[in-house]
């Protein structure tokens, strides 16, 4: 290695590409090494941001009577995007946050969620609940049809994307993620999460009163502003104030 001006990994790469006369069997240590797995990322749909930028959202709001926005994001555990994640949906009009447990941060899992929502709620209710969706440029979100037309038929909603490196544009959801981190601190593995645990966590978070809501809870406002079908589908229930517990042992 001292006579070759390259690192060990580069040398092994040259052997694989047959740039040198030696073969892998001549290198016992090389044979024992496992190849690194390349991360499989979802590729963006070409032109996915056309007419869907944050500036387009502001223009749309200025000319539209409907300003109900649902913010969308993903919260990762210790396993990152390849491990279990939480898909989060935040209704600005009442601060209600929905949580969905996904096996990983992949587009097919996000699609499954929105296919389910459309199937269970029906096109009209889906369109009323999600008139505008605002999300970031995460690879699992870069196909607008996942949200606008989950069953690949009529366009039911409009999706817009934040500017790169501008998570503040959906800052209310980012702020609301703090409630999740009270229960699942950063660095916590999501491997032991179940739908039942996620639902329990969601109900405790949505039953927490907020000063920004004049002392009301997101659950209370959601009963007034959101369709009852959604409340039933997500098994949303109020937790008494004296039983709210936003700590890790809630889901132990």
Predicted regions and their residues:
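Basic, flexible linker segments flanking DNA-binding modules
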Residues: 3-62
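Structured nucleic-acid-interacting core domains from mobile-element enzymes and related host factors
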Residues: 60-70
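Short conserved beta-strand segments at catalytic cores or DNA/RNA-binding microdomains
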Residues: 62, 75-76, 81-98, 103
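Active-site beta-loop-alpha junctions of metal-dependent nucleic acid enzymes
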Residues: 78, 82, 99-124
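Short catalytic-loop micro-motif centered on adjacent basic/acidic residues
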Residues: 99, 131-136
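RNase H-like two-metal-ion nuclease catalytic core shared by retroviral integrases
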Residues: 135-137, 144-150, 159-183, 191-203
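C-terminal domain-tail junction helix/linker
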Residues: 186-252
């Amino acid at each position: 290695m001292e006579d070759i001006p390259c690192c060990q990994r580069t040398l092994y790469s040259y052997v694989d590409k047959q740039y040198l006369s030696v073969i892998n069997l001549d290198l016992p240590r090389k044979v024992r090494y496992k190849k690194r797995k390349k991360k499989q990322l979802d590729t963006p749909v070409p032109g996915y941001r056309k007419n869907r930028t944050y500036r387009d959202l502001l223009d749309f709001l200025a000319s539209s009577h409907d300003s109900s926005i649902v913010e969308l994001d993903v919260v990762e555990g210790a396993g990152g995007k390849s491990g279990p994640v939480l898909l989060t949906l935040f209704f600005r009009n009442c601060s209600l946050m929905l949580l969905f447990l996904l096996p990983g941060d992949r587009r097919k899992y996000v699609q499954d969620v929105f296919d389910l929502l459309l199937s269970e709620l029906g096109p009209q209710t889906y369109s009323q609940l999600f008139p505008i969706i605002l999300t970031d440029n995460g690879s699992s979100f870069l196909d607008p049809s996942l949200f606008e037309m989950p069953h690949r038929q009529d366009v039911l909603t409009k999706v817009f994307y934040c500017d790169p490196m501008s998570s503040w544009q959906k800052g209310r959801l980012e702020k609301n993620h703090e409630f999740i981190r009270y229960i699942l601190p950063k660095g916590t593995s999501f491997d032991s999460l179940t739908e039942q645990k996620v639902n329990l966590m969601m109900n405790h978070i949505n039953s927490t009163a907020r000063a920004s809501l004049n002392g009301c809870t997101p659950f209370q406002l959601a009963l007034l502003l959101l369709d009852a079908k959604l409340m039933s589908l997500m098994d949303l229930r109020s937790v008494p104030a004296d039983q709210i517990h936003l700590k890790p042992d809630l889901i132990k």
